[in-house]
A protein has these predicted regions:
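Phosphate-coordination/substrate-recognition cap region in phosphate-metabolizing enzymes
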Residues: 25-99, 154-178
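Residue-level preference for the first positions of well-ordered beta-strands
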Residues: 137-143
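Short catalytic helix/loop segments, enriched in acidic residues and glycine
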Residues: 9-28
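GST superfamily/GST-like fold recognition
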Residues: 146-150, 186
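Amphipathic, non-transmembrane alpha-helical scaffold segments
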Residues: 17, 21, 42, 46, ...
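Short glycine/proline- and acidic residue-enriched helix-loop micro-motifs
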Residues: 97-117
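Short glycine-enriched, charge-decorated loop/helix-capping segments at active-site entrances
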Residues: 6-15, 84-86, 115
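Short, small-residue-biased leader/transition segments that mark boundaries at the very start
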Residues: 1-3
Length: 193
């Protein structure tokens, strides 16, 4: 979502707004307080997530770690809503239907992805690329998007299809996870209270 213009951004590729840059700097400061040395940053193929990641790395003074970009971590594709103003969408299709498309697990906008379909590309990538690094005791940052992260959190936290509609991930709000040797979540904490 493009906050500046209240647009469904999806796969469109704008940069960060000044608010987005400030949120990334704040997120970096919060992550820096953990005192963790990171091994790798995973991000999407979209510039706003890449910029968020590089701003965070600068804030934690770890600019030299490996950065891996992959479209599997891209935001959800919004189809016919892509690039449209949220209020215009509500006028055209009705507020309730637009809200259902945004939050539902199995219903998506016309021509767009459902959250389930977003997860169908995010989770294999996580399991094939990110999870093995975690199992090697590496510290990873993932700088991605609201819906790609919702898909990942649904898996990690075992959130039901029904409860995922309530999960909201604020922009610029880092979440710290620790995993045991079996890859199960043993600790989770939002760094923004």
């Amino acid at each position: 979502m493009c906050i500046r213009d209240s647009l469904f951004t999806g796969w469109e590729n704008p940069g960060l707004t000044e608010i987005g840059k400030a949120e990334a700097e704040n997120a970096g400061d919060l992550i820096n307080n953990l005192g963790i040395g990171f091994d790798c940053l995973f991000t999407s193929a979209l510039i706003r997530a890449q910029l968020t990641g590089t701003i965070i790395l600068k804030a934690i003074n770890q600019n030299n770690i490996k950065i891996i970009e992959n479209k599997a971590l891209n935001e959800r594709f919004y189809g016919d809503l892509q690039g449209m103003n949220k209020d215009e969408c509500k006028q055209k299709w009705g507020e309730e239907l637009v809200q259902t498309w945004r939050r539902s697990y199995e219903l998506g906008p016309p021509g767009g992805e459902t959250l389930k379909e977003t997860g169908d590309r995010v989770l294999p990538y996580y399991l094939d690329e990110i999870h093995p690094m975690l199992m090697q005791d590496m510290n990873i940052i993932v700088a991605a998007h609201g819906n790609s992260l919702r898909s990942l959190i649904k898996y990690l936290d075992k959130v039901s299809d029904e409860d995922i509609v309530k999960l909201e991930i604020p922009t610029g709000a880092p979440i710290h996870y620790l995993f045991n040797e079996d890859g199960k979540v043993m600790y989770k904490k939002s760094l923004i209270e």
